[in-house]
């Protein structure tokens, strides 16, 4: 009898031995991972990267074999597994970060699991796919149906339905509270954070923050390997020192995940680290041009669905002397990559950077300033509906090519000025009801009399380490100041109030962190809004006649004189009817 009871007790406790074995294996795996991580950062040979090692062999391309007809360009990325690293729940879609390149959203499905029955799934086509951080991709999926999880995963439409519900449980983080980007900056890292709710346009106390580095997602503090102090904090950017063990060789930080925690007056004094989808990356441009001369003048902009304006904006400003372009694309779906490719074929130096984070323009400009610093002496921040104009002086001919570059180059060695500011004139629809075929510079010629705001061109290496900015101008290093350029020397034509079909897109979403969306009943007196409009995109009957106080054809005349084809009269960005 007693022996029978002992056998039963053994059977009852058998699962516990399995559980103990599981935790032992888990602990062993964690220890081995930690050991490998330490080995990587202590080695002088093996920086952590997301790309594999490729030894350099100088062999003529024509002599290289191509087994099975595969090349880098012809390789079918659809044959690679769809490994989702992170998921972020945004207000209007779910963002997935995929560990490899995905060429197209065609035949790519987002898979949603029922919250109460994992075998009940719904498939919806992916909204879009973009390259992200070199060899990764971002995939956008629709919001989940009611009672379905936002922890979306992916599959190709031709894959067998069997096993779709067998995916492991996955996590999803909210856009309201997440570390979303991190950029290496010498022996520090600039960490971009949503949810700290720091004061806008002001520096905050950095002593209240810490950065944590590791290989995992920091679930329950399990992934933290190193912790360092923050040295600056402003708006959505926390700058921290790199861990001491890799400070002398910052490249080893590439690919390490980072998060931020806040020190408070709570019970334990420290908040839990924020969820993070951010891994440390360096500026790709720094690797390319660290030993070469810098461009004199570059431009950075953030846009959404404005590909149709790019050709005119870039062609015109390239003539004025802009040499390098950084386009931060905020979830466009209007074929912008094709436009960028076409411009590069015409020898314009344009890079499109996917910036999927909504309401994060200031952070995006801080990111761009870091990225461009090693390439550019001067960096202009202005929108694709804003055009610099250098009016001719009385008794003088029109200024020639590269005139804007020449203007800023006069101050490249200044020990005083690190920013050049120009005022803006806001133009209205100018009586038009449809978009002008010759572009905005020729089509819109009536504006408000009083100037508004200003736009800036800065020296990136002389920006304050906080990277604090108010959309179009930055806090400068101590000892430097800005220069206001007289209106007679340079001005920006801002084609702000265009024909209604173009203008109404502004109601969808404003990109600035600290500017309310126009559908919201907030700050209706703000200069960001159009006077007289409410919160609904309804065209006023007299829209085409509004914002017209001064007829100004200065830039129109300049463009027609310098850009129009002498035979046909067509402008370079104008679509020929033939």
UniProtKB/Swiss-Prot annotation:
Q: What is the protein's given name? A: Glycosyltransferase family 92 protein RCOM_0530710
- What EC designation does it have? 2.4.1.-
Residue ranges annotated as coiled coil are: none
Enzyme class name: transferase
Question: Mind listing the UniProt keywords for this protein, alphabetically?
Answer: Glycosyltransferase, Membrane, Transferase, Transmembrane, Transmembrane helix
Query: Among its keywords, does the record have Glycosyltransferase?
Result: yes
In what residue span(s) does the GT92 domain sit?
A: 295-531
